[in-house]
Amino acid sequence: MRKAPQQQRSKIIVDHILEATQQCIAQYGLLHTTTPKIAEKSGVSVGSIYQYFENKDQIIEELLRRKSELLGQQLKELVIQQGNIPLELLIPLAIELGFNALKADHGFFIEVLKHWHDYSHSQAAQILEKHFFEVGLYTFSRNPHQWDFEQVKHKSFVIINSTLFTMMRYVSQNNFLISEQQLKRELSSMILAYLSQ
């Protein structure tokens, strides 16, 4: 972001820009979303948009950052709300939450994932990794006799990245010979088997 909004009015303007961007991506696709279209949909002039963002990509990166932060918070809330349920039940719930988030907002994430090579430098993946790692630490700390910190760190990294990549690839290119439900079961089984090692 070029200029972080400080006043409430500025924050509202940025929120309008981000919401309009999400709507434009859903309506026109990522490649055909332009700053003038965002301006038209948001009711914010192109000049005002450029006060906050250098270009369309910077707007999308901020939207990705915020959505990743929200997904991370939702995962933390899910884990805390579930209390001490066994991992065999918690992992499928977390995977379901992830799939729902990737498909939400009229396919925003799906459209961005189709062009991930343009946004792979975004903070979104690091934000999700951080939240998921914290969830892993919280979850595994309930079984301290089973894993030490180094094991948790290593297993979390592998689980987070392999699961995220698989889910992202599936929702962005849904032409695989596996149903979503079957993939969810396979991911859960894979994670549980890996944790049992």
Language model region names:
Residues 1-12:
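N-terminal intrinsically disordered/low-complexity leader segments
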Residues 6, 148-160:
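Membrane-interface starts of transmembrane alpha-helices
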Residues 12, 16, 24-58, 62:
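Helix-turn-helix
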Residues 60-67, 112, 128:
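Alpha-helical DNA-contacting segments of helix-turn-helix folds
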Residues 63-90:
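Amphipathic alpha-helical linker/stalk segments
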Residues 69-73, 89-92, 96, 100-107, ...:
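Amphipathic alpha-helical packing segments from all-alpha helical-bundle domains
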Residues 101, 134-139, 160-178, 192-197:
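Amphipathic C-terminal alpha-helical segment
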